[in-house]
From Swiss-Prot:
Function: Might take part in the signal recognition particle (SRP) pathway. This is inferred from the conservation of its genetic proximity to ftsY/ffh. May be a regulatory protein.
MF GO annotations: GTPase regulator activity
Name listed for the protein in its UniProt record: UPF0122 protein SMU_1061
Disulphide linkage map: none
Name of the encoding gene: ylxM
InterPro entries: RNA_pol_sigma_r3/r4-like, UPF0122, UPF0122_fam_protein, WH-like_DNA-bd_sf
Family: Belongs to the UPF0122 family.
Amino acid sequence: MEIEKTNRMNALFEFYAALLTDKQMNYIELYYADDYSLAEIAEEFDVSRQAVYDNIKRTEKILEDYEMKLHMYSDYVVRSEIFDAIMKKYPNDPYLQNKISILTTIDNRD
């Protein structure tokens, strides 16, 4: 499994998990976060390996579709980069430090 894809799926899952069914959440979490194999997930849920594979592929597409429409993850990445740039350029500015702190709390970055 590609590490970039795994990281992306885990990130998208963090943003959009609430929009998935319980089965989709379980399969994606076990496969990407817990590193279960398709066979292990199939055994756990008493379904075929092919059923797990199909569900995971469908769910990956759903997560990508949510991101394409809502941009929550990509917007978060941009905000994080802006926060980091401000903190680097103005490390001693208490006003900006305070505002960044508020925004990061809202953004759940901590």
